[in-house]
Amino acid sequence: EKAEQSCLGQWFRITVGSVQSLQRESRLSRFEPDYFDTIIIDEAHHAISDGYQRVLQYFNTAQVLGVTATPDRGDMKNLGQVFDSLAYEYTLPKAIKEGYLTPIKAVTIPLQLDLSSVGTQSGDFKAGDLDTALDPYLYQIATEMKKYCPERKTVVFLPLIKTSQKFRDILNEAGFCAAEVNGNSEDRAEILADFDSGKYNVLCNSMLLTEGWDCPSVDCVVVLRPTK
């Protein structure tokens, strides 16, 4: 269900579509409210958002099944607003034990990061304030990365695009081969492909790659986006 393609008038039992397409009134109004018996939502932690709610309220007789690996939202909103019960839970420790996920080895970099002036928004630190608080430590962090992950394929998460771009430059000065990608990058697909193939050994981003991206060769993740 996208662009000029529609399931209406067809005999398909399953329809795949994005919420961005379905939430449009011009498309939604073509359907009878009882058209779907069941709606399955991937990345279901987004189901509370306005777009999903518009679709779910329109098809209000459908059963709803949500699937997500990250049910805990940063704004602390409860998915119980949409889903009545938890059908199945597969925990992180169990997935590691059964070999589906890599065991995590966490290392804390000893920074005396002052977050006292960082404000709060939607239950978490404000990204703009974090940028200011983190900025003086970027060179020190690059030095620590040279100790811990000089030969690893590394993804770095930062609070803002400008911080991500600045840290990319700092890493390149420090001897890494770093790239940066964000939602506005016209060459995003090319950068991701080059990182996957080994052209870059560090990829910086501002929380862009938190879902919908897979790169099994990554063996180090640096989180420079403090959360509560």
Q: Each predicted region: which residue ranges?
A:
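Conserved helicase ATPase core of P-loop NTP-dependent helicases/translocases
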Residues: E1-W11, R27, Q165-D169, F176-T210
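Conserved helix/coil segment N-terminal to the catalytic DExD/H
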Residues: Q5-T38, S49-R54
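Structural recognition of the conserved hydrophobic beta-strand(s) that form the central parallel beta-sheet
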Residues: T15-S18, A62-A69, V202-N205
